[in-house]
């Protein structure tokens, strides 16, 4: 592990994040151009999706976000970095890339409409997750999500049935120890990486399509695990809630789902993270959140962070691009949002 390069990458991302909030948008833009490789590809939430180059990112994502949410500030809950080992075969020679990640909330006043969602002038918290791939002192790729379903709910627009889990819950780690800006403990980091690889590629792929127990999730999660799911699913505050409120409905809908090679998988001390664009492939063969089975093959884009205590996870922060997922069912949640806004205003 090249710790000096890792620490320099952390500083690069932290400096860029800070510059993004500058009140002078030209300075925020200049900082982004400096931080990004000229040919960067950024992978964002549907309907923003894939963009090429720093200018496209600024003009199609960041500047519209700042325009809509006055005084936008980033409150980071987790800051975790490392060298990736995200292939199922464990061939680090074909991966080994350096990543810097973070998650938390953007806070601001919703003063101008955003993506067709009407502004209401009140404070909002927008969940964010980002994974930055760093090479030669520049960010060369960026995978990021904001939780649009949760934002819609804060504006009083429901595009999915009420969450089975607790809505609106996305806190920092209970121990307030998630901002890992210092040098990592190499031994502890390797233990966490090995643990996550076993969990992802052995545990999650073990379902026999009949019983939840076949996955052995109780071997991986503490009984009182805190699982902070995205808008539409909600938070589960125990393993029993996780099984009943998320895992069972998910496996009914996607019984054949399989984790693929991930975009990245890495650890730092007790924490670990993994982005997966098409990280899970499945057939939508059962009902899910009000939608009947479409029998379509779907790819799932998501971001995850975990905290390990010994041999079990005690906290898990989860993003799923629900708009992208439902679009593959043949359901346009953005259009549904606009229809419900129009109906409310009629």
Predicted regions and their residues:
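C-terminal and inter-domain tail/linker signature
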Residues: 1-346
């Amino acid at each position: 592990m090249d710790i000096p390069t890792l620490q320099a990458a952390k500083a690069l991302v932290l400096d860029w994040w800070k510059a993004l909030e500058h009140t002078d948008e030209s300075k925020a833009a200049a900082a982004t151009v400096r931080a990004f490789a000229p040919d960067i590809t950024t992978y964002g939430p549907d309907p923003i999706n894939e963009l090429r180059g720093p200018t496209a990112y600024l003009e199609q994502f960041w500047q519209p976000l700042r325009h809509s949410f006055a005084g936008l500030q980033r409150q980071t809950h987790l800051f975790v970095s490392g060298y990736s080992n995200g292939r199922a075969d464990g061939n680090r020679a074909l991966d080994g890339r350096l990543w810097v990640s973070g998650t938390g909330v953007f806070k601001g006043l919703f003063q101008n409409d955003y993506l067709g969602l009407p502004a209401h002038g009140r404070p909002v918290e927008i969940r964010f997750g980002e994974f930055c791939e760093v090479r030669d002192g520049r960010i060369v790729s960026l995978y990021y999500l904001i939780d649009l379903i949760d934002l819609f709910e804060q504006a009083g627009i429901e595009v999915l049935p009420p969450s089975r889990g607790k809505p609106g819950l996305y806190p920092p780690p209970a121990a307030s120890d998630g901002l890992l800006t210092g040098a990592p403990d190499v031994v502890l980091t390797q233990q966490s990486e090995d643990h996550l690889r076993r969990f992802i590629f052995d545990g999650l792929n073990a379902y026999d399509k009949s019983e939840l127990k076949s996955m052995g999730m109780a071997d991986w999660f503490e009984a009182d695990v805190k699982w902070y799911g995205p808008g539409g699913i909600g938070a589960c505050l125990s393993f029993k809630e996780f099984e009943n409120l998320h895992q069972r409905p998910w496996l009914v809908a996607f019984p054949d789902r399989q984790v693929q090679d991930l975009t990245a998988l890495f650890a730092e001390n007790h924490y670990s993270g993994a982005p997966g664009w098409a990280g899970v492939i499945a057939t939508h063969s059962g009902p899910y959140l009000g939608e009947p089975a479409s029998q379509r093959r779907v790819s799932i884009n998501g971001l995850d962070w975990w905290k390990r205590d010994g041999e079990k996870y005690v906290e898990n922060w989860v993003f799923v691009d629900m708009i992208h997922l439902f679009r593959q069912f043949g359901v346009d949640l953005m259009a549904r949002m606009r229809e419900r806004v129009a109906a409310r205003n009629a």
